Design a protein with these regions (language model features):
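Extracytoplasmic/peripheral linker and loop segments enriched in polar/acidic and small residues
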Residues: 352-355, 405-416, 445-514, 535
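Ligand/substrate-recognition segments at binding pockets and active sites
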Residues: 205-207, 245-246, 264, 330, ...
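Structural transition elements
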Residues: 196, 330-367, 383-388
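N-terminal lobe/hinge region of extracytoplasmic solute-binding protein
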Residues: 40-90, 121, 191
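Surface-exposed binding/hinge segments that line
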Residues: 98, 132-180, 184-202
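Long beta-strand-rich cores associated with HINT superfamily self-processing modules
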Residues: 512-535
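Ligand-site clamp/hinge motif
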Residues: 219-271, 403
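Periplasmic-binding protein-like
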Residues: 297, 301-341, 388-389, 494-502
Length: 535
C-alpha cells in the first residue's frame, strides 16, 4: 500500500481535502496589478549570495539581478550571453573573451573584464565545474576593459561548458570589489547587471522579495532560449511571496491574488489541471533527484558502515508517495546518476534491488560502533521535500534502533545550519535532505555533491581520493562511451563510500494563471524575463 502524505504529514502541513478535488477555500479576490507578477516559490529566500550557497531559490534571485558570460539554451547548448565574441588558440591553451557593449551594473558603473575575472575566480572556488577547470588554469589576464583571457596548463574541453553551467552555483558576474569577498563569506550587496533590480526598500524579508525591471539592461538581439538569448523583461515588477501554507497559496492562486505557484501540492496536480483558469506544466524536463546528505565529519556517518546502513534503511516509496500520492510523476532510482541520463547504470546496486532491509541496517550500524548519541536530522517544515524526508529519516533511524533529534526549522534556517561543521550536539547536524535537477545530478563535474574533496567540498564534506581521480578522468575523457565506462567505476566506488542516499526521482508541476504567458522551462532556474501578464 502506498503511503500518502495525508497519513505521514498529519499535523505537519495544512490539511488538504481528498484527491477527488482540491480543498481550496474561495478567497476574496485581490488581483495583483497588471504589470506585476506575484509568485510563490518552493522556499523563502534567506541567503542573497548565489555563490556562497547552492540553494536553488538563491540561484533564482541571482538570475534576476545578475548575468552570466554564457548561458545554456533550451537544448542545453552553451551560447554567448554577456560575451560578444570569443576564440581559442591553435594549441587550445588560451581562451579570449570580449564583452558586449552597454553592460552596466545597477550602480551605474560599466561591467569590465576585471569584474569578470574576479567573478570567475570566486565562483570557481565554490563550484564543482569551476574547481575542475581552475586546476588547469595558469593565468586569467585582463587585456583591456572589455577583454580577458583564460590561459590553461593543458587542453581542457569543458571551459565553455563550465562558464555556462546551469548547475548551482551559476557563474554570475558581480563587481570586482564584491567578487574579492572570501568565497566562504557571504556577499551582502546586491548590485548586478541583470534584467531586474533588487528593491531592498520594498522587500520585507520573510514576507516578500521585490524585483523591478532594470531600465538600463540591454538584452541580446536573439530570441530567448533557456538561459541564453534576449532576456527581455515585459513586466514592471516581480515579487516572491512567502506563503508557507499550501492551502493558503492555492486559494490565492485560484483567486488571482498570486499569479505563479512553483510547487503546488503534487498530489493535487490532476485536479488543478481541470481548473480552466490555470496552466499546469512541468518546466524542468530533466526532473529532480531527491537525496539525503550525510555528514562525514562526525559520528555515526564518519564511518562508511553507518553510511552504507542508510542505503538499506531508505525506502524511496515512502518519501515519494507522501509527496505525490498516486501520481505517476516519480520513480525509484538506484543510480549514482539521474536515471534516464547517459551516465545511468546499475553497478553496485544490490542494496537497491534488495529493497529496504532494517535488519541489515541495524547490523551495519552495530559494526560501525554506534554509541547511542542522538542523530540530528534537519527537517525544513516549509519545504515540500525536506519536510517529509526529515520525518521519514527520523522514523527509519528509530526503527533501526538509533536515537534521533528531529530538528524542525524553516528552509532558510536549514541552508544556514547545513554549513556548520561543528559536532551535531553543538549546532551541527548529521543529515539533511534536498533536491538536485536531473541534468546536474548526472554530471560529476558540475554537481559539487559528486566531489569528494573533504572540507573544501559541498555540505557533508566527504573525502575519497579514488572519487576525485575518477572525476578528473571523466572530465578529460574524449568520448561519451569512455565517460560511460568511467561512470560505472564512479558508481561502484560511490555506493561503497556513500556521500548521500537517493530518495527518488520526480518531475514536479508548476501552476500559473492563464493570463500569464511566455513562461520558459529550464532546469535549476525559473526565468521571469519573457513572461507577460494580461488583464
Amino acid at each position: 500500500m502506498t503511503t500518502t502524505r495525508r497519513g505521514v504529514l498529519a499535523g505537519g502541513l495544512a490539511a488538504l481535502a481528498s484527491t477527488s478535488s482540491p480543498a481550496i477555500i474561495k478567497a476574496k479576490a485581490q488581483p495583483s496589478a497588471p504589470r506585476t507578477l506575484k509568485a510563490v516559490m518552493h522556499a523563502d529566500l534567506r541567503v542573497l549570495d548565489p555563490i556562497w550557497t547552492t540553494a536553488n531559490i538563491t540561484a533564482y534571485h541571482g538570475a534576476m539581478i545578475y548575468d552570466t558570460l554564457f548561458g545554456l539554451d533550451s537544448d542545453y547548448k552553451p551560447q554567448p550571453q554577456m560575451v560578444s565574441k570569443w576564440g581559442i588558440s591553435d594549441d587550445k591553451l588560451t581562451y579570449t573573451f570580449e564583452l558586449r557593449d552597454g553592460l552596466k551594473f545597477s550602480d551605474g558603473a560599466a561591467v569590465t573584464a576585471a569584474d569578470c575575472v574576479a567573478s570567475v575566480r570566486r565562483w570557481a572556488a565554490r563550484s564543482g565545474s569551476g574547481q575542475s577547470m581552475m586546476r588547469r588554469v595558469k593565468d586569467t589576464p585582463v587585456v583591456d576593459d572589455k577583454t580577458f583571457r583564460i590561459v590553461l596548463t593543458e587542453p581542457y574541453g569543458l571551459v565553455i561548458d563550465s562558464l555556462s553551467t546551469i548547475s548551482t552555483s551559476l557563474c554570475f558576474m558581480v563587481r570586482k570589489k564584491d567578487a574579492e569577498t572570501d568565497p566562504n563569506q557571504q556577499v551582502r550587496e546586491t548590485i548586478g547587471s541583470g534584467p531586474f533590480l533588487y528593491n531592498r526598500e520594498e522587500t520585507r524579508p520573510g514576507n516578500r522579495h521585490v524585483y523591478d525591471r532594470n531600465p538600463n539592461y540591454v538584452p541580446r538581439a536573439e530570441p530567448p532560449s533557456g538561459m541564453s538569448g534576449g532576456k527581455v523583461v515585459k513586466l514592471d515588477r516581480v515579487t516572491f511571496e512567502n506563503i508557507a501554507d499550501e492551502q493558503t497559496a492555492l486559494s490565492a492562486l485560484q483567486a488571482g491574488e498570486i499569479d505563479f505557484y512553483e510547487v503546488p501540492p503534487q498530489d493535487l496536480v490532476d485536479d488543478l489541471k481541470k481548473d480552466p483558469k490555470l496552466t499546469v506544466q512541468v518546466l524542468n524536463k530533466t526532473g529532480h533527484v531527491a537525496l539525503m546528505r550525510l555528514n562525514h565529519l562526525h559520528p555515526p556517518f564518519n564511518n562508511p558502515d553507518a553510511r552504507r546502513a542508510m542505503l538499506y534503511l531508505t525506502k524511496q516509496e515512502d518519501v515519494m508517495g507522501a509527496i505525490f500520492g498516486q501520481s505517476k510523476s516519480w520513480q525509484a532510482c538506484g543510480s549514482y546518476f539521474a536515471c534516464g541520463t547517459p551516465m545511468t547504470n546499475d553497478e553496485n546496486t544490490e542494496w537497491f534491488k534488495h529493497g529496504q532491509d532494517i535488519a541489515k541496517a541495524k547490523e551495519l550500524f552495530q559494526k560501525a560502533g554506534y554509541d547511542g548519541k542522538p542523530v540530528v536530522v534537519l527537517q525544513a517544515t516549509d519545504h515540500y521535500l525536506a519536510n517529509p524526508a526529515g520525518l521519514f529519516a527520523a522514523q527509519w533511524l528509530r526503527q533501526a534502533g538509533l536515537n534521533v533529534d528531529l530538528a524542525a526549522m524553516d528552509w532558510g534556517a536549514l541552508l544556514t545550519r547545513r554549513a556548520v561543521k561543528k559536532p551535531p550536539a553543538e549546532g551541527g547536524w548529521n543529515t539533511f535532505s534536498t533536491t538536485v535537477t536531473g541534468i546536474t545530478f548526472s554530471d560529476p563535474i558540475s554537481f559539487t555533491g559528486q566531489a569528494a574533496n573533504g572540507e573544501k567540498g559541498w555540505f557533508g564534506w566527504p573525502s575519497n581520493e579514488l572519487q576525485e581521480t575518477l572525476r578528473d578522468k571523466w572530465a578529460m575523457a574524449p568520448t561519451l562511451d569512455e565517460r560511460k565506462a568511467i561512470a560505472r567505476e564512479m558508481q561502484k566506488n560511490g555506493w561503497d563510500y556513500v556521500p548521500h542516499v537517493v530518495l527518488g526521482q520526480f518531475f514536479r508541476n508548476s501552476a500559473w494563471r492563464k493570463n500569464v504567458t511566455g513562461v520558459l522551462g529550464m532546469p535549476e532556474v525559473v526565468p521571469f524575463w519573457n513572461m507577460e501578464k494580461t488583464a
